[in-house]
Structures are given as structure tokens and as C-alpha cells.
Amino acid sequence: VRRHGTRLHHISTDEVYGDLEIGEPRRFQPGDPYIPSSPYSSSKGASDLLVRAWVRSFGVEATISNCSNNYGPYQHIEKFIPRTITNLIDGIRPRVYGTGEQVRDWIHVLDHNTAVWDIINKGRMGETYLIGANGEKNNLEVTQMILAEFGRSADDFDHVNDRPGHDQRYAIDNSKLVEETGWAPSFKDFAAGLHDTVE
């Protein structure tokens, strides 16, 4: 990057901030401390800090973004939404971990892409931007929306034991991104984006 004078953008996750209590109004802010709760989020946090060190120590022209949960067509089936969809296609009842009350802030992948593009073109060097589309839904609600897309009953799923250390809620305050770049999501209606994904 330094040798070629290349602009660097590092894409990360909101999981570096830990999780929030269900029902509280607070959302993650760019200056929040890192409190990762898994090996994955710890490694992502470490990579963010490495980029910040490159900026400070070597003057690398870089920005960082921490994004909420992506969804959209052709996502890898290990993820929650495509796994639920493919299970229904294959005749397998979807599974919901624990009560399903865990909240995620969903963003369509195309909106994530345009946000990154705007940061690359309009963002300030050395800054961190949080990408989210104000799409908070709990996992039970998302499962039932997918079931409805398939014409299935809202209770046509199985509850399974919750995962150890399952984060409760993610929510992004995207105001810095919006104010500095003018970005806005195209998929403001999660139901429409979910329908697009299923189709």
C-alpha cells in the first residue's frame, strides 16, 4: 500500500463492540470501546487496530468500516437467513436458537456495497464509519417473515438450545456515515429486501 500509494479501505464488523441489552435505546457509536465476545470478533478488532497503527505510524491512507449483519441473494448458506431459506427449500424445518429474541441490525448487501464506495470516495482518511440501515429485527421475527414468504405457518420451526455466549443485540448509529458522505440505503423496507433475497 505504501509502495504504490494505494488507498486502503478495511471492512470490519460491528461485533467488535460486543453486544447491547435488548430493549435499550443505545446504538453502537464510532468511538465506542472494543469489547469483542468471540474469537472471531477479537480477530476482527485486532485487524482494525492494526490498520489504525499503520495510519498513525506510516501515514497509510486508510479508512475502516464496521458493518451490521448483511443479507441478500447468493449469501453463503452457513449464515442465518440463507440457511433458513435453503432449509425450507429442502423440506427441513428451520431452527431458532433459544427464544429467538436476539436482535440484529440487517442491511442488504447492495446497500453495504454503496456505503463502502461512498466511504472510499468521500470519507476522511484515518476515520472509522459504522454502516447500518436501521433494520433491527429479532431472529424469531425474521424466521417468521421467511416462513410467510413460503406460505408456511408462523410456528413451523423448531426451538433449539441457545449457543453459548450468543450476543443479544447489535444496533448501528450510522449518522456519521450519512452526514459525511450523504449515503442512504436503497432497501429501507426489510420485508422487500427479504422478498428479493428469497426470489
Language-model segments: which ranges?
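Structural element of the ATP-grasp superfamily
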Residues: 51, 84, 177-178
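Conserved Rossmann-fold NAD(P)-dependent oxidoreductase catalytic core, especially the SDR/UDP-sugar
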Residues: 1-37
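Active-site Tyr-X1-5-Lys
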Residues: 3, 19, 35-63, 88-89
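Flexible, glycine-rich beta-alpha linker
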Residues: 17-18, 35-39, 63-80
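Structural signature of beta-strand start/N-cap positions in the alpha/beta core
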Residues: 7, 61-63, 127
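Conserved active-site beta-strand element of glycosyltransferases/polysaccharide synthases
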Residues: 62-64, 95-96
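Hydrophobic structural elements of the Rossmann-like NAD(P)H-binding subdomain
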Residues: 9-11, 65, 84
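C-terminal substrate-binding subdomain of Rossmann-fold SDR/epimerase-dehydratase oxidoreductases
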Residues: 88-199
